[in-house]
C-alpha cells in the first residue's frame, strides 16, 4: 500500500498530530517516510540552498530530530529541507521521491487568509495524483 509517505512539517506544535499518526501507518505498511519542511522566509526564497539564517539552522536541526525519532522506532526516514513556495515545493518532492501518500497537519481555517490566498493543503491536494491525508491538529 503506502511505501513512500511524504510528511510535510512546519516546525510548529501542530506537527505532533501527523507525526504520531504516520508512525503507526508506516509501521503497518512497512513504508518509508520522507520528512519535508519548506523554508519560505526571505533568505530561503532569495538564496535557496545557499541561504544562511538562524531559521534555516533551526529548521535543519528540527528535521534531524524528527528523523531520529522515526528511525529509533525502526521506521526508515529521510529528512529534506526545501526552499521557496511551500505548495510548489511539496508537489515537486512528491514527484521526485515517488511518494504514494502525502500527509499534512492542518491549522484549521483562518477565514480571510484562506479565502484570498488559499491554503497549502488545498493547493497540494488539487495538484498531486496521490492520496493526501489531512489531519487537523488539536
Model-assigned labels for residue ranges:
Residues 105-126:
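Glycine-rich, Arg-bearing micro-motifs that act as flexible, cationic patches
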Residues 7, 33-35, 62, 69, ...:
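Short, structured motif recognition centered on aromatic/hydrophobic residues
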Residues 68-102:
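Structural beta-alpha unit
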Residues 51-54, 96-98, 120-122:
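Short, hinge-like loop/turn segments at secondary-structure boundaries
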